[in-house]
Amino acid sequence: MSGPVDTAKSITKKRKRKHGGGARAATETDDATTQPVVENGAVTDSPEKGEDTKKSEKNGKDKSTKKRKVSHASSDEENESEGEQGAPSQADGDSDNNGDDGDDNSEAENGDNGDKKDAESTDLPSADALRLPTVEGEPQKFTELGLTEKTLKAINDMGFDTMTEIQRRTIPPLLAGRDVLGAAKTGSGKTLSFLIPAVEMLSALRFKPRNGTGVIVVSPTRELALQIFGVARELCQYHSQTYGIVIGGANRRAEAEKLMKGVNLLIATPGRLLDHLQNTQGFIFKNLKTLVIDEADRILEVGFEDEMRQIVKILPSEERQTMLFSATQTTKVEDLARISLRPGPLYINVDHRKEHSTVEGLEQGYVICEADKRFLLLFSFLKRNLKKKIIVFFSSCNCVKYHAELLNYIDLPVLELHGKQKQQKRTNTFFEFCNAKQGTLICTDVAARGLDIPAVDWIIQFDPPDDPRDYIHRVGRTARGANAKGRSLMFLQPSEVGFLKHLKEARVPVVEFEFPANKIVNVQSQLEKLIGQNYYLNKSAKEGYRSYLQAYASHSLRSVFDVHKLDLVKVAKGFGFSTPPRIDIQLGASLSRDKKQQQQGRRNYGSQPHSKGLKFKRKHDD
């Protein structure tokens, strides 16, 4: 039977299945977009598939019948070798329905000779059989890496030609199978640095859905995981391998179903990944060949150290290549590298020779502003830059919620992004802002790491960053890519100018910006009147005020950001209160725990104090 007929037959079988066939492992919203392309590719002969068919006929024309006779015997051997893993052996039972337990793209990719390839060997080739390109000299372009045509075509579609420094220095050794510990500033192109070798490995080993997961990428935040998933989708568009994502807040059952069908390239956040590793039956990860830990320092900062240790312990270590990327090298990162990387990893740091820790093309400044004038300055700035694309960073979820409600109420539209939102809301907001040509996003540091948001004009740090590293990651949301431009502005109170010394030590160049006093719109009286009359805004403002003080008290640089030096009357005016509201908060106790909770977005703001600590009580009326 000719190849195209077999493909059409398998697709007909797929359509008869109760649930419509195994969709490509991806997010629920991705299935609709990938499936039509797959079906068209399976039914019609594209030029790419025609070449594969000709090669197959040329190399094995006389042996095709013999290979088909062997197919069932090979499948039986596969069933025995798979041991207790039922899902892959069941899919291997009949060469005609290989795709039934896999995905549409797997069939579309193999096209005419897919059944022949499966019949030859259903076992996953060992790492000894892996032949990735060997790169000589100093490659500058992706075409010099010896990548597969499918990968090169995808990279070309993405608009990339010349590699960044981190890509030039990491991709060749990763293709050679080395473990790599990489350090590069944000916006340097790390994502493609680890995805290209991962996809090439999966392709070289001819991973099928029944083989389970071959690559796992661990990301610190859901938004960054979604972004990596988007890049992986573009990179894998011409490959047959499946890809998927598992993140907190998403439908766990749907994720488990896709994992059981087989996800070759998996992007995940640590908590949800550990959950599936421990509890999802049929999740095959015994064939794992590559583990990627992206933004390792951030993963450890937000409290996932225990989860990462368990994940590394659970995953198979034999023949596993590990790629660990971190913007900064801390003691915890070194500990994680020691338990996850094989002996003798390659350490690549592309930043240590740079004069500045931030990217070129980024104009950075600060403005000295009293606490009671901060909102007025922000309001005036946003009003004057309505045609720009701006990100404003705050220190807590409640501060973001209050300012979003206030600005939208007074007809200055903004989007908000923080850790207390439901996952669907966070995802929708993220992509809405990515696709917007102008607008303002106010957010916590949940958006500070790794997110590649196009064409951001301004980064405003309304609340101070925790340390210079956080500053660098915040401003890294602009001036991304080659020759890109961007500007950042940091608000500092007079008591906070000591932070400039820390930035200088971290090789961050900042200059003072001046904002003429006559350009500041004085809406203080209207603001206080609005907060006094609107119950919901008043309640939100009070929560924001409380959260601001708690976040300030848990600052890691308390020698600079000392809560005792704050003028609470001026701070309260910045939140729209004529006099400081009565609040009851706990300051000074369990600061490290509070800090950890703040970074995770799960902080218990406004909790009543039950232990020793510093209390701030104001006996004024609300």
Curated annotation (Swiss-Prot):
Residues 46-63 have a biased composition (Basic and acidic residues). A motif (DEAD box) lies at residues 294-297. GO terms for cellular component: nuclear envelope; nucleolus; preribosome, large subunit precursor; small-subunit processome. Residues 598-610 have a biased composition (Polar residues). Residues 93-112 have a biased composition (Acidic residues). It catalyses: ATP + H2O = ADP + phosphate + H(+). ATP binds at residues 184-191. A motif (Q motif) lies at residues 140-168. Belongs to the DEAD box helicase family. DDX18/HAS1 subfamily. The keyword Transferase does not apply. One of its GO terms (molecular function) is ATP binding. SUPFAM superfamilies: P-loop containing nucleoside triphosphate hydrolases. ATP-dependent RNA helicase involved in 40S ribosomal subunit biogenesis. Required for the processing and cleavage of 35S pre-rRNA at sites A0, A1, and A2, leading to mature 18S rRNA. It is an enzyme of class 3 (hydrolase). This is ATP-dependent RNA helicase has1. Transmembrane segments: none annotated. Its main location: nucleus. Residues 1-137, 588-622 are annotated as: Disordered. PROSITE patterns: DEAD_ATP_HELICASE, HELICASE_ATP_BIND_1, HELICASE_CTER, Q_MOTIF. SMART domains: DEXDc, DUF4217, HELICc. Associates in the nucleolus with the 60S and pre-60S ribosomal subunits. It comes from Neosartorya fischeri (strain ATCC 1020 / DSM 3700 / CBS 544.65 / FGSC A1164 / JCM 1740 / NRRL 181 / WB 181) (Aspergillus fischerianus). Keywords: ATP-binding, Helicase, Hydrolase, Nucleotide-binding, Nucleus, Ribosome biogenesis, RNA-binding, rRNA processing. Coiled coil: none annotated.
